[in-house]
């Protein structure tokens, strides 16, 4: 059994991870940690997340001694804020742990990126260079050898899974950037109380227009520029991305179909829809990404749907664990 600790276990993603680790036949839960100043320290995780009652009732421990915690673990899941992950990861890695970071701290290898989009200077360039981007369907070979996996963001997951088959097969017009409009539920903002994510205050609205940190993440790993506009929706969980593209000259519907089927026929977490478009209801509380598309003339619209807390975070992290240690890819997920 691989001893597994979750850092930042009090949040929505941490709770999902705790349940997955509990269900996994080859993982054991060695610790649920929160920060020293967390108001939740000492509480049972099931006190915060009632669905875990009688299943995972362990107490949330303050992370006081990082080196000691590292010595007691094989696998670390960082469900922490970006700068917290940045500061913690190296200690776990230097103690030989395999780290799966759900923050953005190690996703993009571009000079100046972290100071511009995350507000801090990256201090661990060597680990940033070694980090493997954990888009499970597209990077399995590298994930299987990695010590540090940077689990993608929720919007980048939905966007890249929809676009990568088209970009790889060179089916898109390179002179016109794909336009991504994506809407997320309020759990994407985390568990901490905020007026902007309060149910009575949320109204469908774009945010981060032209400057959201996920735009350069998508572009960096997709290999082409995009226009990305996120929206906040008044529902709990899920992401729906609607992507408008222009096809390269002469591309046929058959080529598009073949590109998606070649990419995803053997990937159980991606479901290709025929004659229908994805909807959040079908992926909510599942590890799946549903993809549908329609062609009209030289334009193609692709739609993808995921659960932002699962395929957009915790279940993708678990997919990466399964790939890294040679377990079936959906172990503990269905």
UniProtKB/Swiss-Prot annotation:
It catalyses: N-acetyl-L-glutamate 5-semialdehyde + phosphate + NADP(+) = N-acetyl-L-glutamyl 5-phosphate + NADPH + H(+). Gene3D superfamilies: Dihydrodipicolinate Reductase, domain 2, NAD(P)-binding Rossmann-like Domain. Keywords: Amino-acid biosynthesis, Arginine biosynthesis, Cytoplasm, NADP, Oxidoreductase. The active site is at residue 154. Its EC number is 1.2.1.38. The keyword Cytoplasm applies. GO terms for cellular component: cytoplasm. GO terms for molecular function: N-acetyl-gamma-glutamyl-phosphate reductase activity; NAD binding; NADP+ binding. Pfam families: Semialdhyde_dh, Semialdhyde_dhC_1. One of its GO terms (biological process) is L-arginine biosynthetic process. Pathway: Amino-acid biosynthesis; L-arginine biosynthesis; N(2)-acetyl-L-ornithine from L-glutamate: step 3/4. It is found in: Cytoplasm. PANTHER family: N-ACETYL-GAMMA-GLUTAMYL-PHOSPHATE REDUCTASE, CHLOROPLASTIC-RELATED (PTHR32338:SF10), N-ACETYL-GAMMA-GLUTAMYL-PHOSPHATE REDUCTASE, CHLOROPLASTIC-RELATED-RELATED (PTHR32338). Belongs to the NAGSA dehydrogenase family. Type 1 subfamily. Catalyzes the NADPH-dependent reduction of N-acetyl-5-glutamyl phosphate to yield N-acetyl-L-glutamate 5-semialdehyde. This is N-acetyl-gamma-glutamyl-phosphate reductase. It comes from Aliivibrio fischeri (strain ATCC 700601 / ES114).
């Amino acid at each position: 059994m691989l001893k597994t600790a979750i850092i930042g276990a009090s949040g929505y993603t941490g709770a999902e991870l705790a349940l997955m680790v509990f269900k996994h036949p080859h993982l054991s839960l060695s610790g649920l940690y929160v920060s020293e100043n967390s108001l939740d320290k000492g509480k049972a995780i099931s006190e915060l997340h009632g669905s875990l009652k009688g299943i995972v009732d362990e107490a949330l421990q303050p992370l006081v001694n990082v080196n000691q915690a590292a010595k007691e673990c094989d696998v670390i899941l960082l469900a922490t804020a970006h700068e917290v992950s940045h500061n913690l990861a190296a200690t776990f890695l230097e103690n030989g742990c395999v780290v799966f970071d759900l923050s953005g701290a190690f996703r993009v290898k571009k000079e100046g990126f972290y100071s511009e989009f995350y507000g801090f200077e990256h201090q661990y360039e060597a680990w940033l260079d070694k980090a493997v981007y954990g888009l499970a369907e597209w990077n399995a070979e590298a994930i299987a050898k990695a010590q540090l996996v940077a689990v993608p963001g929720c919007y980048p997951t939905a966007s890249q899974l929809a676009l990568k088959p088209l970009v790889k097969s060179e089916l898109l017009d390179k002179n016109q950037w794909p336009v991504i409009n994506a809407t997320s539920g309020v759990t994407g903002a985390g568990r901490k109380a905020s007026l902007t994510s309060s149910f009575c205050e949320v109204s469908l609205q774009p945010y981060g227009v032209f400057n959201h940190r996920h735009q350069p993440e998508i572009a960096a790993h997709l290999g082409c520029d995009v226009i990305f506009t996120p929206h906040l929706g008044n529902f709990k969980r899920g992401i729906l991305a609607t992507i408008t593209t222009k096809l390269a000259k002469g591309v046929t519907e058959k080529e598009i179909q073949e590109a998606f089927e070649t990419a995803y026929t053997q990937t159980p977490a991606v479901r290709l829809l025929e004659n229908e478009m994805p909807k959040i209801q079908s992926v909510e509380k599942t590890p799946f990404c549903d993809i549908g598309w329609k062609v009209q003339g030289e334009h193609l619209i692709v739609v993808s749907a995921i659960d932002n807390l699962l395929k957009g975070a915790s279940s993708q992290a678990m997919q990466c664990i399964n790939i890294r240690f040679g377990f079936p890819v959906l172990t503990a997920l269905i």
